[in-house]
């Protein structure tokens, strides 16, 4: 399994902000660490998120909901979720509207982590 480092994610965030606008900066490093580590945690030999689809969705969900960055939390959450899945051989097919609806509804608290997992599985090719 391929994972992105914290440094890579910070670099990607800075590039997203540069390209799409907003304020660069980390609001809370602890919340970022929590979002990045949660998908890979477990207890004893039991992985909390055993599938790559679950790990990718948890990564996106944590980045969106933890609000670790000053700006661009939804953008980085969506981007990192898709990048992680792609790096691990999982390609998705979706419209921009479908992705936007997912991310905005997660950010608004209308969809939960489980909904993101279902979305990923539904759109997997």
Residues covered by each model-derived region:
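FIC/Doc superfamily catalytic core
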Residues: 1-125
């Amino acid at each position: 399994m391929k994972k992105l480092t914290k440094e890579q994610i910070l670099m990607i965030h800075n590039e997203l902000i540069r390209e799409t606008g907003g304020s660069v900066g980390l609001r809370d490093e602890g919340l970022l660490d929590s979002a990045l580590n949660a998908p890979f945690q477990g207890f004893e030999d039991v992985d909390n998120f055993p599938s790559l689809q679950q790990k990718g969705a948890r990564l996106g969900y944590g980045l969106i909901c933890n609000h670790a960055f000053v700006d661009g939390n939804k953008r980085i959450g969506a981007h990192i979720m898709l990048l992680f899945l792609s790096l691990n051989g999982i390609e998705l097919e979706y419209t921009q509207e479908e992705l936007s609806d997912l991310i905005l509804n997660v950010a608004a608290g209308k969809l939960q982590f489980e909904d993101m997992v279902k979305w990923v599985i539904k759109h997997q090719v």
